[in-house]
Design a protein with these regions (language model features):
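Histidine-dependent nucleotide/RNA phosphoesterase domain, centered on the 2H-phosphoesterase fold
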Residues: 2-245
Length: 245
């Protein structure tokens, strides 16, 4: 059973979609939430972050983005006139969960966390990245279905609690997405929404989640960069079935 998602004003969208499985419901929900945005914020003007800070995060990264990169660059070219900060090819990622600031997490805790995640109760899975929607600070792909991503978040959150790390937002507030461009100033949202809308007819791109990455994340030149601590493999469905037999 997947954990329940709740309404959370700090999340975007604040309320979860009616279904965590139905792609049409999720994509439409993301789009309607973006359409209601009146002003976009400067993504980089965020409390708790500076260029000198380093934080541990669980992410899914794309060493070989392939078709995802093609679709991303197509959308970025179409939005170039907006002057947003495009996510570079080697910066594409899906953020899963914050672990904690580097100075708040000991080496022993990192090792314990990695030990705890060697046998996550979540099998490798596939999702689709759908062009295109956005938030108050970014333009982003919608991801479907949410259910396996929510299960992965919950498993990582549980491991973090067991390891005693500061942790991030609860699973109830998790809203999966994949950002492709960040707003670098306060701006009126309707112009961005109008530019994004024609791109919604593009077909989705399949993404394969076979690993989850613990990274040391930093902000650099108005993008995110990271050092991968370890890529943790997710068991195949066949392996999981055998283990449960």
């Amino acid at each position: 059973m997947s954990p329940e998602l709740d309404t959370d004003p700090s999340a975007f969208p604040s309320a979860p979609p009616a279904s965590l499985d139905d792609p049409e419901v999720i994509v439409e929900h993301d789009w309607r939430a973006f359409q209601r945005v009146e002003r976009m914020a400067d993504h980089w003007d965020r409390p708790g972050w500076s260029d000198r800070q380093r934080k541990y995060y669980w992410m899914h990264t794309f060493p070989d983005p392939g078709q995802l990169l093609q679709r991303t660059e197509h959308c970025q070219r179409a939005l170039q006139h907006l002057g947003m900060d495009p996510v570079p090819a080697d910066g594409l990622h899906v953020t899963l969960l914050r672990v904690g600031a580097v100075d708040q997490v000991s080496t022993a805790q990192v090792e314990h966390l990695l030990d705890l995640t060697q046998e996550l109760p979540v099998s490798a899975f596939h999702v689709l990245a759908h062009p295109l929607a956005g938030s108050r600070g970014a333009v982003r792909f919608s991801l479907t279905p949410w259910k396996p991503l929510v299960r992965l978040h919950a498993a990582l959150h549980a491991a973090g609690k067991q390891a005693g790390v500061p942790g991030g937002a609860p699973t109830t507030a998790f809203r999966p997405h994949l950002g492709i461009a960040y707003s670098n100033q306060e701006r009126s949202a309707p112009a961005v929404i109008d530019a994004v809308e024609p791109l919604r007819s593009l077909p989705p791109v399949p993404l394969h989640f076979t690993t989850v990455d613990l990274v040391e994340l930093r902000r650099q030149d108005r993008t995110y960069r990271w050092r991968t601590i370890r890529s943790v493999p997710l068991p195949s469905s066949a392996t999981s079935r055998t283990a449960l037999a």
